[in-house]
Amino acid sequence: MKLLISFILRKVPRKYIQRVDEPILGLIGFFLRGNTYTCPIINKSYRKFLPYGRVKPRPNALCPGSLSLERHRLLWLFLKKKTDFFDKQLKFLHIAPEQCFMKPFEKQHGDEYLPADLESPLAKV
């Protein structure tokens, strides 16, 4: 299984992977439900997160529900606790948007949020 995933990640362009990774990982997340790890982005708990990394995968790095990594969850907590980012509706352009932030930012800021990327099929521009 690891060899298959590694092969897909090396050979299939990222823009195609982004179209199918959310439903597939969501299904995997259903089977990983538990109370050990909580993702602050979606407020869901899992008994474990998925490993992530090519050379030496980090255990419990990828949240199957939000597709966030450690750095994304840390940034989310910083924005939530140390800034007023979620207290008001802001107008901003998000260059190379992280997939885990797109839905929450869209919900919070509505039409004022504009994700932009050269290759991502998820970005608006």
Annotated model-derived regions:
Residues 2-125:
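Conserved N-terminal segment of class I S-adenosyl-L-methionine
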